[in-house]
Amino acid sequence: MYLADYHTHSRISPDGKFTMAQMAQAALDKGFQEICFTDHVEPINWGETTLCPLPYNWEPLRREFAAAQAEMGDQITMRLGIELDAMFDIGHTMQVLQGAPEFDFVIGSVHMLSREKMGGLDLYFFQPENEEQAHAGIRDYLDQVRQFAQWDGSYSVLGHLTLPLRYLNELRGFHLTFDDYEKEVEEIFRSLIERGRGIEVNTNRGNDPLPGEKWLRMYRDLGGEIITLGSDAHNTANIGCAIRQRQELLKKCGFEKFCTFEKMVPIWHKL
């Protein structure tokens, strides 16, 4: 079994705490052969809805990865990626990416509700009073994901498709699903597949995977092949969490292989 964690956050992310070297050592200690660092790159200022200043400062990321390479050597394969927030202004996003390092892998993720309809609220802070409001948030989120899936920019996979469920169910006490949105999810998958993009299975640090079995089967039935696995770890304790179990889930859903990436090109591994 080839073990690779393709969604991790180091101290370069505002919500990360550990060095890349510490994260890589944790992965190595848990029997992993590969880790990809996917620190947040957000075209808006963290915790706000205002656009970040330009040019974007890539030097902290470059230095951190170089230090990890120097410390870890060839003990474990390390890839440099980012989690790019799919935000309101694609033009600004393209400017943010100017001067970026050469990435191996890019996750495209939506973390916020629309600025026009929902005030640009981060999903983490979304506190609907009832299911009607919660579903309004889900619809808004899926509309943003739909738009992003039609973007022809440079990214590898769509991150944690069913992310609102992490917050609505795990934090707010709802018991919601995406079952009412099959048409919307299918459209998103078709857009990704047509453009040669994939999805991730976000193990959600051992909680319900994002997305779950129903949607993984739909993606596979539509012809989707490109798929990665990542823990979304923001600390060393969660590195690699539930990756083994989610590999088994992929096999159950009919997948025979999964991807890692090098210089934005998928490398296939048998499940």
Predicted regions and their residues:
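Hydrophobic faces of well-ordered beta-strands that scaffold small-molecule active sites
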Residues: 4-8, 35-37, 78-82, 106-108, ...
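Short acidic/histidine-rich active-site segments
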Residues: 40, 161, 224-241, 260-261
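Glycine/small-residue-rich hydrophobic helix-like segments
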Residues: 186-233
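An N-terminally biased module of ancient metal coordination in phosphate/nucleic-acid-related enzymes
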Residues: 1-91, 97-100, 165-169, 173-179, ...
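Extended substrate/RNA-proximal surfaces in nucleic-acid metabolism proteins
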Residues: 51, 55-194
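C-terminal regulatory/interaction regions
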Residues: 253-257, 262-271
